[in-house]
Amino acid sequence: MAQFLRLCIWLLALGSCLLATVQADCSQDCAKCSYRLVRPGDINFLACTLECEGQLPSFKIWETCKDLLQVSKPEFPWDNIDMYKDSSKQDESHLLAKKYGGFMKRYGGFMKKMDELYPVEPEEEANGGEILAKRYGGFMKKDADEGDTLANSSDLLKELLGTGDNRAKDSHQQESTNNDEDSTSKRYGGFMRGLKRSPQLEDEAKELQKRYGGFMRRVGRPEWWMDYQKRYGGFLKRFAESLPSDEEGESYSKEVPEMEKRYGGFMRF
């Protein structure tokens, strides 16, 4: 007896679930018919739903609606919503891949994952640069003290994640073009500039030369140098003789070329 009651309860629960599913499908189909008709009043929505569910003896309205659905099924906009979304996502990914080359293949999934884990709140949009810097841990950040560099990385990340503004990007591109030379000189201290430099940058270059000039410079010759000479015969002998000795260092420093003076022995072997 207990098993029979349990079976009846399960049948009632299953029947109610199936009934709810059928009712939802019937309501959706009747709504499509009303949308497709030029005059929605031609079909009674309630009668169509009841006939679809089998609660009315007549099936005239439901048969008409079913024929209409079979004829005009591909024309309903909500049937192709998923297809439109997929095509739009593919177009956006194609444009980003075309614009940034292989950058999105390497880091696109990383930034999208971080954007899903840490969504930006509306009140935090004003400080977008700081939030992006905290979120990505300095990713794409060259110099934390430069506002232009941080703004550049912020705009790039916003554009890749779909949160940028076109007008803001256009205005910022104009400003970054005007300040490109200043940011380059600040970042590299005249490294990428030509021979003509301002006195202030010249003084900064001299200070850097005094501080880091001989940092990478070798003192004397390493022990493995003789091993290379023995192994390769006299192949490296000419290059070894061209290097100045410790005694000739002072006289050699007076004759170094302009490149050596500028970078303070940084490029010297």
UniProtKB/Swiss-Prot annotation:
Keyword Transport tagged: no
Highest taxon of source: Eukaryota
Post-translational modification: Proenkephalin-A is cleaved by CTSL to generate Met-enkephalin. The N-terminal domain contains 6 conserved cysteines thought to be involved in disulfide bonding and/or processing.
Swiss-Prot/TrEMBL GO biological process terms: aggressive behavior; behavioral fear response; cellular response to cAMP; cellular response to oxidative stress; cellular response to transforming growth factor beta stimulus; cellular response to virus; cellular response to vitamin D; chemical synaptic transmission
GO cellular component labels: axon; axon terminus; cell body fiber; chromaffin granule lumen; dendrite; extracellular region; neuronal cell body; neuronal dense core vesicle lumen
Short name of any one Pfam family annotated for the protein: Opiods_neuropep
Compartments (UniProt record): Secreted; Cytoplasmic vesicle, Secretory vesicle, Chromaffin granule lumen
Residue positions assigned to the propeptide: 198-209, 219-229
Cystine residue pairs: 26-48, 30-52, 33-65
Annotated positions for site Cleavage: 111-113, 133-134, 216-218, 220-221
Entry keyword annotation includes Ubl conjugation: no
Family: Belongs to the opioid neuropeptide precursor family.
Protein name in the entry: Proenkephalin-A
Species for this entry: Rattus norvegicus
